[in-house]
Curated annotation (Swiss-Prot):
Keywords: Calcium, Cell adhesion, Cell membrane, Glycoprotein, Membrane, Repeat, Signal, Transmembrane, Transmembrane helix
Gene, per the UniProt record: PCDHB13
Annotated localization: Cell membrane
Record domain Cadherin: where: 36-134, 139-243, 248-348, 353-451, 456-561, 568-671
Top-level taxon: Eukaryota
SUPFAM superfamilies in the record: Cadherin-like (SSF49313)
Organism of provenance: Pan troglodytes
Job of this protein: Potential calcium-dependent cell-adhesion protein. May be involved in the establishment and maintenance of specific neuronal connections in the brain.
Protein name: Protocadherin beta-13
Entry-linked PANTHER family: CADHERIN-87A (PTHR24028), PROTOCADHERIN BETA-13 (PTHR24028:SF318)
Length: 798
C-alpha cells in the first residue's frame, strides 16, 4: 500500500509539474468545436475524444484524459473506457444563454503522461421550441378620422425566446379595407409591427374595427402567436404631444433601491382642454422591462420596481408614449445603462488537491484551482494570495492557479500546514473569498536515531547473578512511523581479545543491557564497547554510543598475612632484650588483601597477649612494639595474636600469631665477647642452627614476597588484555595502612648474632636489628616519649 501511494503521488507530481506549461500553450491553440441541439436527452453522444485526439483506446485510457470546466458545473461527462463524450443532462439553450447567440459552453481537455491541455467549446444549437407571445393579448389603437392614408401606428411587439431564424420573422394582419401591417426592426434587432392606414376612415360609417395581429417566426415549421387589435375611430384632434427630447440617456447603479427615481420625461401638447391632457405609459415594453420599471402616468417619472443586476442585463431601452385625450401620441426612447457595483465576491473552484506531500520534494504541486468573479471591470479583476510565512507559493496561468511548495519541507519541524487561500477583487469595497485547506507532510527517513548520551557509564558489583539487568541505553528518532522504530545492537569491539558476546547482551527493542555471566573484579575491573541504534527506514540510518562498564569490588577476599608466615610449621619467635626501651620495634606484621579500595585498606590490632599491656601494635602499619619497660618479673615467653582486618562491608579479617622471647643481656647494640669462650664444638653447633633458621625464614619470606608480586603483575596483565581496568580511588583513612608496594615489608631487617661464652650452655645471648629505634644520644627524650607512647605510635594494647 505504501509503495502504491508513493507511485500515485509521483504521477500527480508529474501531472501538475507540466500543467503550467500546458495552460500557457493552450491559450494559443485553436479550440476544438463541437455542437449539440438543445433539448437533446442526457447521456447523448457528442463526440469520441479518442478519435479526435488520434489516440488508440489503450493509449487513451493510459493517459487519464479528463474534462474540466472553469465554471462550477460541467455539462459533459467522459467515458474513460470508450472515449465517448456524453451529455450530463438535457440542455435548454434559453436557460443557458438567453438571447445570446451563439450559445457556447467552453471546457478543457487534460491529458497526462505526457501532459497536454486543449481548449474546447460546445455550441448549443437553438431549435424552434417557443412560439411568439404577445404580452398584451388585446391592443387598443385610437385613430382620428382625419388621419391621412399612410399614417403609421406602431403596435406592441411579440416576444419569442428562440433566437436567429427561429425568432420573430414578420407580422401579418387579418384582411380589411383600411389597414395593412409592416414589420419594422429596432436597433437591438428586435422586430415590431407597425399599422399603416391605407384608406381614410369615416367615424360615421365605421366607429371601430377589430383586427387580428399575427406574429410569425422563421422556424420550420413556423410558429405563431396572435393578439386582438381594437381600432377606435376618433373625432379630429390635430396636435400630438411632443417630448422635450426624443432620446434620454441615463445611468443607474445596480444597487439602487426599489422605488429609486430613474428619470423624469416630459411632453407637451399645444391643444387645449381634453385634447391637451397628456398621460404617460411604457410603450411596447418587454416582460423584463415591465417587471423592472414603472412610470407615473401623470408626471412621467420612471421608477425602479425591482433590484437591478448588472451581471444579467447591462442596459435597458425603454420606449415611452405620451398620449393626449384624443388620438395623437408622441414617443421617446430612454436608454438606461446599469453601472456595475462590486456585489459579487470572487469564486474559487478546486480542481485537484494532494495531501499528504513528501517533505523532501521542492516545487511539489499541492492544489490546482480556478477563480472567477461575476462583476466586470475593476470589480471583476482578481488577486490571489496565501500567508507570507508559509513555504508555499502560487503560480498563475489565465484564471488557473497552482499551489506548490517553495522549498523542501521538514516534517520534524512542522507536520502540517493550515493554508488559507485569499481571493480578492479590486472593486470598492473589495470583496474576498477565503478557502482553508490542511496540507499534511509525509515523513521521509532523513533523521538518524540519536542517543540521549554520547557515552554511558554503568556500574556492576562483582559476583553478580547471570542475566542481571545492568542498565539501559536509549535513542530517539525524530521521524515517524517505521522511520522512527529503533533497533539496538552491540557493535564489534575495537579490542579483538574482548569476549563481548559472552559478557553482555542487549535487548534489540528497548536497549536494556544484561550481564551474561558473573563478573570478577580481581580478574576484570572494567571494559567498554559501542552500541548501535538503527531505524527501519529505507535506507536505514544509524548512530552509535560508547558504553563503559565498571565492575565494583565486593569484599570477597580476606587479608592474607605475608609475615610472619602462618603455615602451621614451627612458630616464628622474635627475641626482645629485657633492656629494651618503650617503643622498641619487636617485628612488623605484613599482610595484603586481594580486594581494592576501602576493601583493601587494612588495620591492625592486638587481639590477645600473654601479658596485656606489655606489647602494642601500630594500627597503621602493623609494627609490634614494646609498650613499657621490661622487668625481671615479666615472663620470658609471650604469645601475641594480632588481628588484621580490612575496611569492607562486612569486614573480613585474619589472625597472625607471634611468639616473643625476652632475652637477658640484649639491651646494647654491640656486646663484648666473654673472656672465656665456649668450646668450639658447642659454638659451631649453635651457630649452624641459628644461621639455618635465619636463612630459612628469610628465604621463605622472600619467596612469599616474590610470589605475591608475580600474582599481582599477572592479574594486571590479564585485566589490561581484556579491557581498560578502572580501579576506584579515594583518600586513605588515617587509621588504615596503605598497601603500596604489594604488601612487602617496608624495611629490611638485618640481624647480628653473638654467642655468650663461659656458661657452657650455648645460650643465645644477642639478636636485634641494626636499625636503631631511638636516638641513643637523647635518653631523656626517650623517657619523655614513653608518657605519650600510645598516641605517638598508635599501639593497640591488650
Amino acid at each position: 500500500m505504501e509503495a502504491s501511494g508513493k507511485l500515485i503521488c509521483r504521477q500527480r507530481q508529474v501531472l501538475f509539474s507540466f500543467l503550467l506549461l500546458g495552460l500557457s500553450l493552450a491559450g494559443a491553440a485553436e479550440p476544438r468545436s463541437y455542437s449539440v441541439v438543445e433539448e437533446t436527452e442526457g447521456s447523448s453522444f457528442v463526440t469520441n475524444l479518442a478519435k479526435d485526439l488520434g489516440l488508440e483506446q489503450r493509449e487513451f485510457s493510459r493517459r487519464g484524459v479528463r474534462v474540466v470546466s472553469r465554471g462550477n458545473k460541467l455539462h459533459l461527462q467522459l467515458n474513460q473506457e470508450t472515449g465517448d463524450l456524453l451529455l450530463n443532462e438535457k440542455l435548454d439553450r434559453e436557460d443557458l444563454c438567453g438571447h445570446t447567440e451563439p450559445c457556447v459552453l467552453r471546457f478543457q481537455v487534460l491529458l497526462e503522461s505526457p501532459f497536454e491541455f486543449f481548449q474546447a467549446e460546445l455550441q448549443v444549437i437553438d431549435i424552434n421550441d417557443h412560439s411568439p407571445v404577445f404580452l398584451d393579448k388585446q391592443m387598443l389603437v385610437k385613430v382620428s378620422e382625419s388621419s391621412p392614408p399612410g399614417t403609421a401606428f406602431p403596435l406592441k411587439n411579440a416576444e419569442d425566446l428562440d433566437v436567429g431564424q427561429n425568432n420573430i420573422e414578420n407580422y401579418i394582419i387579418s384582411p380589411n379595407s383600411h389597414f395593412r401591417v409592416l414589420t419594422r426592426k429596432r436597433s437591438d434587432g428586435r422586430k415590431y409591427p407597425e399599422l399603416v392606414l391605407d384608406k381614410a376612415l369615416d367615424r360615421e360609417e365605421e366607429a371601430e374595427l377589430r383586427l387580428t395581429l399575427t406574429a410569425l417566426d422563421g422556424g420550420s415549421p413556423p410558429r405563431s402567436g396572435t393578439a386582438q387589435v381594437y381600432i377606435e375611430v376618433l373625432d379630429v384632434n390635430d396636435n400630438a404631444p411632443e417630448f422635450e427630447q426624443p432620446f434620454y440617456r441615463v445611468q443607474i447603479s445596480e444597487d439602487s433601491p426599489v422605488g429609486f427615481l430613474v428619470v423624469k420625461v416630459s411632453a407637451t401638447d399645444v391643444d387645449t382642454g381634453v385634447n391637451g391632457e397628456i398621460s404617460y405609459s411604457l410603450f411596447q415594453a418587454s416582460e423584463e422591462i415591465g417587471k423592472t420599471f414603472k412610470i407615473n402616468p401623470l408626471t412621467g417619472e420612471i421608477e425602479l420596481k425591482k433590484q437591478l443586476d448588472f451581471e444579467k442585463l447591462q442596459s435597458y431601452e425603454v420606449n415611452i408614449e405620451a398620449r393626449d385625450a384624443g388620438t395623437f401620441s408622441g414617443k421617446c426612447t430612454v436608454l438606461i445603462q446599469v453601472i456595475d457595483v462590486n456585489d459579487h465576491a470572487p469564486e474559487v473552484t478546486m480542481s485537484a488537491f494532494t495531501s499528504p506531500i513528501p517533505e523532501n520534494a521542492p516545487e511539489t504541486v499541492v492544489a490546482l484551482f480556478s477563480v472567477s468573479d461575476l462583476d466586470s471591470g475593476e470589480n471583476g479583476k482578481i488577486s490571489c494570495s496565501i500567508q507570507e510565512d508559509l513555504p508555499f507559493l502560487l503560480k498563475s496561468a489565465e484564471n488557473f492557479y497552482t499551489l506548490l511548495t517553495e522549498r523542501p519541507l521538514d516534517r520534524e519541524s512542522r507536520a502540517e500546514y493550515n493554508i488559507t487561500i485569499t481571493v480578492t477583487d479590486l472593486g470598492t469595497p473589495m470583496l474576498k473569498t477565503q478557502l482553508n485547506m490542511t496540507v499534511l507532510i509525509a515523513d521521509v527517513n532523513d533523521n538518524a536515531p540519536a542517543f540521549t548520551q554520547t557515552s554511558y557509564t554503568l556500574f556492576v558489583r562483582e559476583n553478580n547473578s547471570p542475566a542481571l539487568h545492568i542498565g539501559s541505553v536509549s535513542a530517539t528518532d525524530r521521524d515517524s512511523g517505521t522511520n522512527a522504530q529503533v533497533t539496538y545492537s552491540l557493535l564489534p569491539p575495537q579490542d579483538p581479545h574482548l569476549p563481548l558476546t559472552s559478557l553482555v547482551s542487549i535487548n534489540a527493542d528497548n536497549g536494556h543491557l544484561f550481564a551474561l555471566r558473573s563478573l570478577d573484579y580481581e580478574a576484570l575491573q572494567g571494559f567498554e564497547f559501542r552500541v548501535g541504534a538503527s531505524d527501519h527506514g529505507s535506507p536505514a540510518l544509524s548512530s552509535e554510543a560508547l558504553v563503559r562498564v565498571l565492575v565494583l569490588d565486593a569484599n570477597d577476599n580476606s587479608p592474607f598475612v605475608l609475615y610472619p608466615l602462618q603455615n602451621g610449621s614451627a612458630p616464628c619467635t622474635e627475641l626482645v632484650p629485657r633492656a629494651a626501651e618503650p617503643g622498641y620495634l619487636v617485628t612488623k606484621v605484613v599482610a595484603v588483601d586481594g580486594d581494592s579500595g576501602q576493601n583493601a585498606w587494612l588495620s591492625y590490632q592486638l587481639l590477645k597477649a600473654t601479658e596485656p599491656g606489655l606489647f602494642g601494635v601500630w594500627a597503621h602499619n602493623g609494627e609490634v612494639r614494646t609498650a613499657r619497660l621490661l622487668s625481671e618479673r615479666d615472663a620470658a615467653k609471650h604469645r601475641l595474636a594480632v588481628l588484621v582486618k580490612d575496611n569492607g562491608e562486612p569486614p573480613r579479617s585474619a589472625t597472625a600469631t607471634l611468639h616473643v622471647l625476652l632475652v637477658d643481656g640484649f639491651s646494647q647494640p654491640y656486646l663484648p665477647l666473654p673472656e672465656a669462650a665456649p668450646t668450639q664444638a658447642q659454638a659451631d653447633s649453635l651457630t649452624v642452627y641459628l644461621v639455618v633458621a635465619l636463612a630459612s625464614v628469610s628465604s621463605l619470606f622472600l619467596f612469599s614476597v616474590l610470589l605475591f608480586v608475580a600474582v599481582r603483575l599477572c592479574r594486571r596483565s590479564r585485566a589490561a588484555s581484556v579491557g581498560r581496568c578502572l580501579v576506584p580511588e579515594g583518600p586513605l583513612p588515617g587509621h588504615l595502612v596503605d598497601m603500596g608496594g604489594t604488601g612487602t615489608l617496608s624495611q629490611s631487617y638485618q640481624y647480628e648474632v653473638c654467642l655468650a661464652g663461659g656458661s657452657g650452655t650455648n645460650e643465645f645471648k644477642f639478636l636485634k636489628p641494626i636499625i636503631p629505634n631511638f636516638p641513643p644520644q637523647c635518653p631523656g627524650k626517650e623517657i619523655q616519649g614513653n608518657s605519650t607512647f600510645p598516641n605517638n605510635f598508635g599501639f593497640n594494647i591488650q
